[in-house]
């Protein structure tokens, strides 16, 4: 301090312009107001943590998409067959996941509004019905994948047997047509057996007029004639009691009808009867909901799916003819009561056997 004062005094006396030393300069700066000597802050140097995270996520997503696109192009160029299977599998997972979310939403609405299955709209009922079948098949594949290293074998089996182990979400467009033809061929094998059982049962019908009408109907179908709706409805009394009511069907009849409905026939007779009745009741409920909605409100794919469920191989039939056939089915179904649903079950064979191109 004494030295600095001496320097300043000498400078004042001599009128010199000598600058103070670095130590003195720093002391003078420290003596001034504090904030004045600091450098101004720059907002660009201090980004918020949220902005940094968003920029990082955006960068990672962009890079991932670019790498994924390059990977897809590589597979498409060098492994086209594998790439087709890969894209079909990935799309199938997305569609199955979307179906699961939709089914969950429908079930939640049913619980909140205290609705029963038959009180839903047609599309909601059909979605739940189909999703239950799909998820049952997926659960079976999941169960056989549980043992260690079994998942590798399951992937191989899914590649070799896609029709048996995979649902339609994982089929290619060509496979969908081919597999539906295969399934229809399986159920067509039972058509002649179902008609034979009907002819045999006609001998036990007590009413003479009904017995003759049932025999004539079997003869028409066996000769290649498509029956009219009024001819089928005239026999509704035969299917409410012995010998063709649900409770009176024999085991061989139920096995043949199960094959016609694409259900397993290898179950005890009580389970076969219960399962056939349950599926027929669901179809009857769907028919009532569809009649309320109107066939004209359905898309072409929805019409084909509805016809296929009811026994018609609609994959090779024009849309207008599918709608006409579905109209005949609904006319019969909506005229039946619950005790007469055995006729609706047999309708799977009676109405589909000789309809247009379905007979091959």
Curated annotation (Swiss-Prot):
The keyword Phosphoprotein applies. Residues 178-360 form the Letm1 RBD domain. Induction: Up-regulated in white and brown adipose tissues upon cold exposure and beta-adrenergic signaling. The modification Phosphoserine is found at residue 192. Disruption phenotype: Homozygous mice for Letmd1 gene are born at normal Mendelian ratios, with normal morphology, bodyweight and body composition at 2-months old. Mice could not tolerate cold exposure without food. Mutants exhibit impaired thermogenesis and are prone to diet-induced obesity and defective glucose disposal. Residues 1-110 are annotated as: Required and sufficient for mitochondrial import. GO terms for molecular function: molecular adaptor activity; ribosome binding. Interacts with BRI3BP. Interacts (via C-terminal) with SMARCA4; the interaction regulates transcriptional expression of thermogenic genes in brown adipose tissue. This is LETM1 domain-containing protein 1. It comes from Mus musculus. The lineage of its organism: Eukaryota, Metazoa, Chordata, Craniata, Vertebrata.
